[in-house]
Structures are given as C-alpha cells and as structure tokens.
Amino acid sequence: MALSLSLFLGGRVRTSLARCGFASQVMAGPGSVSCEPDPDSDWEPEERELQEVESALKRQKKAMRFQKIRRQMEAPGAPPRTLTWEAMEQIRYLHKEFAESWSVPRLAEGFDVSTDVIRRVLKSKFVPTLEQKLRQDQKVLKKAGFTREIGQLPVSEDTLKALSAGRSVSGLLMAGDEVSSKSQNHSTALKVAKSHPHSTDAQKKREGRDKRIQVLEESLVPATTALGHQRELQKSATSDSEATGRAGSDTLPSAVLLEELKPGEPGDQSFSSKVVQRGHDFFDSNGNFLYRI
C-alpha cells in the first residue's frame, strides 16, 4: 500500500515538473534553469491531490502505530473463546444474508461480546475438525458457568454421522447427560430473558405484588381467626345464659303453684300441709319432691 502510494506520488510530481518546463530544459542541454509556470495550467487540482495523498499516508502511519501499541498492551495470543461454533456460524450467516440489519455493533450486542470478537469471527476462515469443535465447545460451556465437570466425550461414528447430518455440536454435548441438559435449558432461559427484558421486568413486578398480597393475607388470617373465636365465645356464653334462664324458669314454681301449696288451704289432698327444705330442694312431709330453687 505504501509502495503504491509513493509511486503514485512520484508520478504526480513528475507530471507537475513536466508542466512547468523543467523536463524540456533538461532535454535541450545545460543552461540556466528557470521554471516558469504555464499561465494556462490549473495548479489547484494538482495541489489538492497531493494533499489527499499526504493525508492518506499520515492516516495509514497513525493506524499502524495504533495497532502496534494495541498489540503491545494486550495479552499475547488469541483471546479466550466465548462463543460456540454454532453461534459463530450463526453470526457469519446473519452478517452475510442480512448485512444491513445485522451490523457488527448489533451482532456484538445480540451475542453479548465485543465488536473485536465479532470482527475476528467474520475474518476467520479456519475450518476445524469435528474433534476440535467438540473440545472447544466443551471449554466454552465450562467457562459459561457450568461448574459440573464434563468428561471428555468419545467421538464415535454415530457422533460423526450426526454432525455431518447437520446436528448442532452443543446438542450432542448435552445428549445423555441430565444435569447438563438442565444447565442448557437454564442458559436458553437466560438468552430469552436477555432478548425480552421488558417481559422479565413485568414478571418480576407481578411476582413481587403476589408475594406482598400473600404476606398481607397471612397477617390477616390470625386476626380474623381470633375475631371469629371471640364471636363464638360470645355466642356460646349467650346461649348458656339463655339455657340457664330457661332451666330456671322450668324449675322455679309459678305463683299459682305456690298458692296451691300453701299450708292450711283446702286443695289437692295429695299434698301435705308441711313443706321441708333441704338445700335448694323442697319436699313434703311424706318425702315427695316438690320443686327446686
């Protein structure tokens, strides 16, 4: 790039010198060298082109210096892989088929990585073997938060056939492992939650409101129970007093009966003229029970 720009710049300089008559004087022979500009020539476009070339060279040198400083500041070697091969293939497909809607910044935001990682994925032309895909996807899944140790899976012929048929590597890694399948479902739920943050916030608010209502109901249950118990006690006390009143009215003799039982008055000859009291009970002289107070 720098060589082509320098050749282009040299050609422009030679053209400018030829216009001012320097080349013709050299070809004619020795003598006084005088560069008289042609009054009909236009110098502004030539100067503009020279300035553009110089600014392009400066920008290129600045970019090269920046890249050099960046390589010195960063850790040596490739950055740790955070994407599975399935995700990288999806990134390449989206950028190729829908380049306008899926730009590099949007891909970085959607896959939760930096723009440098997206550019590295798009620039890479490396095609790994099936064993390398399995091994690298295992590392990515471990680094994503799956604390359970995933053993080295033997690459059988069935696995190779499934991969060649188009099945995802992550699906094969999770096959036959219950805990790993649960963790994969958890990661899928996290992706859905990230893609729908508003629905997640609304669900959290609804759950918080339900919890508050449940706490209020639990706090109101003891008070309601105590109030109901108190009302039941009042009702039982009222019913007991009413029953006692009814029992007293049933046991107490009426005024007519007392008048009939007065001694010395002619009446029923079955009653004796003498009434004996024993506590709250009253008996006649023969020992027959009369009434109770």
Swiss-Prot record:
Induction: Highly up-regulated in neuroblastostoma cells by RA and MG132 treatment inducing neurite outgrowth.
Residues with Phosphoserine modification: S41
Coiled-coil regions, chain positions: none
Compartmental location: Nucleus; Secreted; Mitochondrion membrane
Sorted UniProt keywords: Developmental protein, Differentiation, Glycoprotein, Membrane, Mitochondrion, Nucleus, Phosphoprotein, Secreted, Signal
Tissue specificity: Expressed in heart, brain, liver and kidney. In brain, mainly expressed in neurons rather than glial cells.
Region called Disordered, residue ranges: 177-210, 224-254
Basic and acidic residues bias (residue ranges): 198-210
Glycosylation sites: N185
GO biological process, one term: mitochondrial ribosome assembly
Superkingdom of origin organism: Eukaryota
Signal peptide bounds: 1-18
Main location as per UniProt: nucleus
InterPro entries from the UniProt entry: NGRN/Rrg9
Keyword check for Coiled coil: no
GO molecular-function terms, A-Z: rRNA binding
Assembly: Forms a regulatory protein-RNA complex, consisting of RCC1L, NGRN, RPUSD3, RPUSD4, TRUB2, FASTKD2 and 16S mt-rRNA. Interacts with 16S mt-rRNA; this interaction is direct.
Family listed: Belongs to the neugrin family.
Main function: Plays an essential role in mitochondrial ribosome biogenesis. As a component of a functional protein-RNA module, consisting of RCC1L, NGRN, RPUSD3, RPUSD4, TRUB2, FASTKD2 and 16S mitochondrial ribosomal RNA (16S mt-rRNA), controls 16S mt-rRNA abundance and is required for intra-mitochondrial translation of core subunits of the oxidative phosphorylation system.
Name listed for the protein in its UniProt record: Neugrin
Organism this protein belongs to: Mus musculus
